[in-house]
């Protein structure tokens, strides 16, 4: 059975970087997908599907549920390894419920943990505005993305706490410390 780890955190929390390092250092057993990267790859392809996605991403808005869930389920189904890390998902109660429904309806993938990388809004803002990753890294879009992240957060935390799969990590430390803690946690659950 494949084991799924979801990593959530504010924009700029470091969730993608943390997951990339862990997957790179454990390439024999762990594969990582970033929801944002999966969607950005589709946009970069220039497809009609990509243009639809871009009309949401460029404004900092959530991509429609069916597109995101389809993208995630497709990535899980085609994952070449048995341990899968997906960061940036879920970002809404609807995304959470849709994935939960899909996972309950099958027996190939087990959600092992949802890891929340915690950072303050000021640290997140400083990090995002200090990087130049894309057109979506400006103050207005950051503020929108932060609201989009914070609005459903308590409900997402409660949902996964009840399932006993929520694990919080302090994201305001040196990246080596964060990665070390996250990697130990994941390996302990493999």
UniProtKB/Swiss-Prot annotation:
Stretches the record annotates as LID: 130-136
Keyword presence, GTP-binding: no
EC main group: transferase
A cellular-component GO term for this protein: cytoplasm
Subcellular location field: Cytoplasm
EC number, UniProt record: 2.7.4.3
One example GO MF annotation: adenylate kinase activity
TM stretches of this protein: none
Catalytic activities: AMP + ATP = 2 ADP
Pfam families: ADK
Binding site for ATP: 12-17, 131, 173
Residues that bind AMP: 35, 40, 61-63, 88-91, 95, 133, 145
GO BP: AMP salvage
Presence of the UniProt keyword Lipoprotein in the record: no
InterPro entries: Adenylat/UMP-CMP_kin, Adenylat_kinase_CS, P-loop_NTPase
Pathway: Purine metabolism; AMP biosynthesis via salvage pathway; AMP from ADP: step 1/1
Renumbered residue ranges of the record's region NMP: 34-63
Quaternary context: Monomer.
PANTHER family: NUCLEOTIDE KINASE (PTHR23359)
Protein family per UniProt: Belongs to the adenylate kinase family.
Domain notes: Consists of three domains, a large central CORE domain and two small peripheral domains, NMPbind and LID, which undergo movements during catalysis. The LID domain closes over the site of phosphoryl transfer upon ATP binding. Assembling and dissambling the active center during each catalytic cycle provides an effective means to prevent ATP hydrolysis.
Summary of the function given for this chain in its UniProt record: Catalyzes the reversible transfer of the terminal phosphate group between ATP and AMP. Plays an important role in cellular energy homeostasis and in adenine nucleotide metabolism.
Name of this protein: Adenylate kinase
Species this protein is from: Helicobacter hepaticus (strain ATCC 51449 / 3B1)
């Amino acid at each position: 059975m494949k084991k799924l780890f979801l990593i959530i955190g504010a924009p700029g929390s470091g969730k993608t970087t943390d997951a990339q390092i862990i997957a790179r250092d454990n390439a024999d057993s762990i594969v990582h997908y970033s929801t944002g990267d999966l969607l950005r790859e589709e946009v970069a392809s220039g497809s009609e599907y990509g243009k639809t996605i871009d009309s949401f991403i460029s404004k900092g808005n959530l991509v429609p549920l069916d597109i995101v869930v389809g993208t995630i389920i497709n990535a899980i189904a085609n994952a070449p390894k048995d341990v899968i890390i997906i960061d940036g998902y879920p970002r809404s109660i609807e995304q959470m419920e849709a994935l939960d429904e899909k996972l309950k309806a099958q027996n190939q993938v087990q959600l092992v943990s949802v890891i929340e990388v915690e950072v303050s809004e000021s640290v997140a803002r400083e990090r995002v505005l200090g990087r130049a990753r894309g057109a979506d890294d400006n103050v207005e879009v950051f503020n929108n993305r932060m609201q989009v992240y914070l609005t459903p957060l308590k409900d997402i935390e409660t949902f996964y706490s009840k399932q006993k799969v929520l694990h919080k990590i302090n994201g305001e430390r040196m990246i080596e410390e964060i990665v070390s803690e996250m990697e130990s946690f994941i390996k302990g659950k493999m």
